[in-house]
Amino acid sequence: MASGRDPREPLPGWLEIWDLDREPWDEWLQDMLRDLNEEARRHFGMNMLIRVWNYCVEEGRRHNTPWNEIGYKYYRIVQKSMFVHFRCGCRRRGPFSPYEERRNGQGGGAPPPPPGLA
C-alpha cells in the first residue's frame, strides 16, 4: 500500500445497520410478514401466532423498541419456528385444524364428524 489508504471498505456504523425508517425496509418487512403469516397459519394456527406477536409487542414496549424492530423480531421467531417445524418432517399442506383426528402421532384433536355430516 503505497498510498497509505486501507483498500477495504469501512464497516458501517451501528446506526447505518439499524436505520429501520427507510422505505424499502418497511415495504420488504410488510411483504415478508404477509407471506410468512400466510404459510404459518397452515401449520401453527392463529392462536399461537397471536401469542408470539403479543410477546414481541410486550417486549418492545418494555424496551421502547420501534415498531419495525418489533415486527422483525416476530418475523425471526416465526421463521425459525417454521424451519424447525419443517426440519422435523411436517407434511401438512392443508389449512391448520386443531380438532382433526390424531392417529399414530399424526394430526391432532377430536375425531372427524360422522360421514354425511361433514
UniProtKB/Swiss-Prot annotation:
GO terms for biological process: symbiont-mediated suppression of host innate immune response; viral life cycle. Pfam families: VPR (PF00522). The keyword Lyase does not apply. One of its GO terms (cellular component) is virion component. Keywords: Host nucleus, Host-virus interaction, Inhibition of host innate immune response by virus, Viral immunoevasion, Virion. It is found in: Virion; Host nucleus. Its main location: virion. Residues 98-118 are annotated as: Disordered. Plays a role in nuclear translocation of the viral pre-integration complex (PIC), thus is required for the virus to infect non-dividing cells. Targets specific host proteins for degradation by the 26S proteasome. Acts by associating with the cellular CUL4A-DDB1 E3 ligase complex through direct interaction with host VPRPB/DCAF-1. This change in the E3 ligase substrate specificity results in the degradation of host SAMHD1. In turn, SAMHD1 depletion allows viral replication in host myeloid cells by preventing SAMHD1-mediated hydrolysis of intracellular dNTPs necessary for reverse transcription. Belongs to the lentivirus VPX protein family. Interacts with the P6 region of unprocessed GAG. Interacts with host VPRBP/DCAF1, leading to change substrate specificity of the CUL4A-DDB1 E3 ligase complex. This is an African green monkey isolate. This is Protein Vpx. It comes from Simian immunodeficiency virus agm.grivet (isolate AGM gr-1).
